[in-house]
Design a protein with these regions (language model features):
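Active-site groove signature of glycoside hydrolases
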Residues: 118-136
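Beta/alpha (TIM)-barrel catalytic core signal, keyed to glycine-rich beta->alpha loops juxtaposed to Asp/Glu
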Residues: 134-323, 327-331
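Structural motif
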Residues: 40, 44, 120-121, 154, ...
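Aromatic/hydrophobic pocket-lining residues that form the small-molecule binding cavity
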Residues: 34, 38, 110, 114, ...
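N-terminal binding-site loop/beta-alpha segment at the start of enzyme catalytic domains
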Residues: 1-80, 316, 320, 331
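Active-site mouth loops of central-metabolism enzymes
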Residues: 20-32, 96-111
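Structural preference for beta-strand elements that scaffold enzyme active sites
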Residues: 11-15, 47-48, 78-84, 125-128, ...
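Structural motif corresponding to the early beta-alpha repeats
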Residues: 77-103
Length: 331
């Protein structure tokens, strides 16, 4: 494993997104197995772990923070623990055809969230505290002011925003410097490349979630793939039979590049972004130790600037299906 900087925070070049251990991909994973997986990640040199207060199971809506905190307790002094605040779910909105994600960044809510997360994680500080989604009702400057206070109090060391626009970034950073922005990013979802110039100018890192487009880019799925009950991929556009046909050229390109580099398709999907910018850190999730090792190995794959440019040119040219992306939030 090698390491890079998000702002002035040093993390492993590949992190571990932990949401899928508790939710969204069928039944929750076995807790003992996931604790062992997280320990294995530490042994592989992964130091960057991502969770959130709202990642949970039907029995415990905050399960993921408890799981991750317990697993990392023996390693706490050598890992970077990231969690998130600022949303809750209102499932009744689904009946109205709306997103169930409701942003809430009122200062009192933020303070309650940080204290609850510290308790669930079993730690005295959070290394990186993200605003999970921008709240249009609360000015960015007000949220940043609360973050500055939490840093002074020692409850958090760094802060960031997830799914942020350039305006959000500039306004927040002017009050309390951001360490990272976490947005959806993959070969199939590149719209956030437009904020790279401002990140470079301000010295902010970029954390890429869903770097495999929820698994499509690993090449492990085809038009016959079926998903378990409760697996959100069953409803994602990129997994339909028509989409798989539409994405055939992209998957062929990945297999070709993988063969040339002695790698896997998934490793190429990660190496592409790692070699594109030195401040990009992907956080793929997994429940499997073999996939974890494969993802960690992507940090050692070298693509030249010419390789990356050639891949980008191909991505710009080729047909590609719709991909599950940012959802509209309740205003």
């Amino acid at each position: 494993m090698n390491y890079r900087k998000l702002g002035n925070l040093t993390v492993s070049s590949v992190g571990l997104g932990c949401m899928g251990m508790s939710q969204s991909y069928g039944a929750p994973a076995d807790k003992k197995e996931m604790r062992e997986l997280i320990a294995a990640a530490v042994d592989m040199g992964i130091t960057f772990f991502d969770t959130a207060e709202v990642y949970g199971t039907p029995d415990d809506p905050h399960d993921n923070e408890r799981l991750v905190g317990a697993a990392l307790a023996p390693h706490r002094n050598k890992v970077v623990l990231a969690t998130k605040f600022g949303i809750h779910f209102d499932m009744s909105l689904l009946k109205e055809g709306k997103s169930p994600i409701v942003p809430d960044a009122r200062p009192a809510v933020i303070r309650a969230s940080v204290d609850a997360s510290l308790q669930r994680l079993g730690t005295d500080h959070i290394d990186l505290f993200y605003q999970h989604r921008v709240d249009p009702k609360i000015p960015a400057e007000e949220v940043a002011g609360v973050m500055a206070d939490l840093i002074k109090e020692g409850k958090i060391l760094h802060w960031g925003i997830s799914e942020a626009s350039e305006e959000d970034i500039r306004r927040a950073h002017a009050v309390c410097p951001l360490t990272a922005v976490q947005n959806r990013y993959s070969m199939m979802a590149r719209t956030h490349e437009r904020i790279f110039p401002v990140l470079e100018k301000l010295g902010i890192g970029f954390v890429a979630f869903s770097p495999f487009a929820n698994g499509v880019l690993t090449g492990a799925y085809d038009r016959t793939s079926a998903f378990a009950e409760g697996d959100m991929r069953a409803r994602m556009p990129q997994f339909s039979a028509a989409a798989m046909a539409e994405n055939a050229e992209l998957l062929t390109l990945l297999r070709k590049l993988a063969a040339e580099k002695g790698a896997t398709s998934g490793q190429i999907a990660l190496a592409w972004m790692l070699c594109k910018k030195p401040y990009i850190v992907p956080i793929p999730g997994t429940r499997k130790r073999a996939r974890l090792a494969e993802n960690a190995g992507a940090a050692d794959i070298q693509l030249s600037a010419g390789d990356v440019a050639a891949i980008d040119a191909e991505l710009d040219r080729m047909p590609m299906s719709a991909v599950f992306g940012e959802v509209r939030m309740k205003k």
